[in-house]
Amino acid sequence: MSLADELLADLEEAAEEEEENLIDEDDLETIEEVDEEMQVDLNAESVKSIAKLSDSKLFSEILLKIEGYIQKQPKASEVMGPVEAAPEYKVIVDANNLTVEIENELNIIHKFIRDKYSKRFPELESLVPNALDYIRTVKELGNNLDKCKNNENLQQILTNATIMVVSVTASTTQGQQLTDEELERIEEACDMALELNQSKHRIYEYVESRMSFIAPNLSIIVGASTAAKIMGIAGGLTNLSKMPACNVMLLGAQRKTLTGFSSTSVLPHTGYIYHSEIVQSLPSDLHRKAARLVSAKCTLASRVDSFHENPEGKIGYDLKEEIERKFDKWQEPPPVKQVKPLPAPLDGQRKKRGGRRYRKMKERLGLTEIRKQANRMSFGEIEEDAYQEDLGFSLGHLGKSGSGRIRQAQVNEATKARISKTLQRTLQKQSVVYGGKSTVRDRSSGTASSVAFTPLQGLEIVNPQAAEKKVAEANQKYFSSMAEFLKVKSEKSGTMTQ
């Protein structure tokens, strides 16, 4: 295989991996497309000319069927075989689809009322952004804006702070009075919107009551309303059980936003599961992570429900408990950093800076006086070997002529060896008794000698007993026991005395 073929093969593998992470085009059909602009005829005489759902045959038939099934309470034993085969299941799916159409119809009616009522109170649109709250407020105020003050019905619709802002703005608005015909059209649109909203809530209640029999495990995890919505978009419980978890998470996603609403709050690839109560109960930074986890568990629960394996919902409770445990684990504070004690220092061999052995070593290895003199130099004096006449290091003060005296080594009195007084007396007695010097004998041996240096004779060996012998010979003349009397003659008298 050539190098080009290997590169092409690598690119193909990378493309296959990207395709696995992407969503199939068939699955993209489940994402709802919302028109960027609602085509509303502002010149329409009545709201019924643009909002035709409430008068449609499908709307009335579904509501009649729902009323009939509400009166009959199903039993768990009656749910057999595929869920799609049950006649009531089709009504549930149609009711789910009808709620989506009701939402779109409410948006159309809201835009119709907003455009018509802007003639009277144009600032109300920015003060009350919610569609249903806006419709209820318009119905309550009508053509008389003074109703904002001390209105108990309005307090049930808006908060006190919003009512205060609306009342202040209403007193300074530049709007014009509506005619009776315009006011009648607006009130008719408001009544239709409120009726549609009431029908939507009734459908939700019915679907939620039936989801405990159709998909009990799925309803336990995400709630009956969300379970009914994702089942309706997926095309049934069987189709939902065949979908992967990554596509289940996208069910109910919207591609575009409605006209007049900000697009910054719209999150891409977020469906009904993302907006469910179990996911929205967490902090915002965990929403996507939680939606992935919940969609995976919903896939497992839908597969269990499609085969009616656990109608009492035990598996659903187990899965929800596992989800809640993971949610709690995610929200746990980080563990407290353990305060570790300092490690024991590595005590190596310390340098001994005192003691008898250290002093002896320092004396043995210390600098001698000769070395100190060789290392010492005088400032401002030229050295003898400054011109490199001699090889080697300079001798410093040692190489200079001095007085000729040799400085005696200083004795350190602190380290000087001492003997006790008792030992001194003992040594003195021994020297007197055993080795003491007297007129008869001496301690020194006869062969003892000393070496002396004299400037005249150089090296001279001296007998230390020579001086003593001279003294003894002189004393023998006068103090000898053999000495005789001497005769002294006087020259004058000529006599001799003895």
Curated annotation (Swiss-Prot):
Keyword entries, A-Z: Coiled coil, mRNA processing, mRNA splicing, Nucleus, Ribonucleoprotein, RNA-binding, Spliceosome
Database matches in Gene3D superfamilies: 1.10.287.4070, Nop domain
GO BP annotations, alphabetical order: mRNA splicing, via spliceosome; spliceosomal tri-snRNP complex assembly
Annotated positions for site Interaction with U4 snRNA: C246
Localization: Nucleus; Nucleus speckle; Nucleus, Cajal body
Compositionally biased tracts (Acidic residues): 7-24
Locus of motif Nuclear localization signal (NLS): 350-363
Domain of life: Eukaryota
GO molecular-function term, one example from the UniProt record: U4atac snRNA binding
Domain (Nop) ranges: 214-332
Region (Disordered): 1-24, 333-356
Record-level GO cellular component terms: Cajal body; MLL1 complex; nuclear speck; nucleus; precatalytic spliceosome; spliceosomal tri-snRNP complex; U2-type precatalytic spliceosome; U4 snRNP
Record remark: domains: Interacts with the snRNP via the Nop domain.
Function in brief: Involved in pre-mRNA splicing as component of the spliceosome. Required for the assembly of the U4/U5/U6 tri-snRNP complex, one of the building blocks of the spliceosome.
Subunit note: Identified in the spliceosome B complex. Component of the U4/U6-U5 tri-snRNP complex. Component of some MLL1/MLL complex.
Protein's UniProt name: U4/U6 small nuclear ribonucleoprotein Prp31
Taxonomic classification: Eukaryota, Metazoa, Chordata, Craniata, Vertebrata
Gene name per UniProt: prpf31
